[in-house]
Amino acid sequence: TQSRGGRGVNAQNLKDEDYVKSLYVASTHDHLLFFTDKGRVHHRKGYQIPEAGRTARGTAMVNILPLEQGESVTATVITREFFEDEYLMMVTQKGTVKRIPFIALNTRRKTGIRAITLDEGDQLINVIRTNGNDNIILATREGMAICFNENDVRPMGRDAAGVRGIMLTGNDYVIGAEKWEE
């Protein structure tokens, strides 16, 4: 442990324009699901991600996943195994939500699979892992929010587009979605 005046240890050397958006702890046996803004999901095992030292710069996602031009990872879900009683709630920028059984994404393809069908100009902003009875809250840029139980959205298949989660007006769009626990 550190005493007073401790300075800590530098964990990572970053370039000026780089920043750490998310940090995950995973085993080599864990399944990592990477969701992109275009609605695709890439499935990798932990051992397929390059290991690096404490001060390494890391590896760009485009060098690990076959991403298209302009495509980026917006959400990551890590699990040891796929459970039948768990779900994933997908939320798009235009307010669409989709609830899919977690087990439905236990498919591996090198190029990824389509997890949600998106409308023109829409993009996936978050994926939330739920237990089947969680409350979800959506928030928009103009300060609107809605909270609903995930059971209000029926489970759908992989190719479904989802249902409207929040009504948007003007140029408003969804900026965040999370699980809400009382």
Kindly give the residue locations of the regions a language model identified.
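Short, structured "edge-of-domain" segments at secondary-structure transitions
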Residues: 1-182
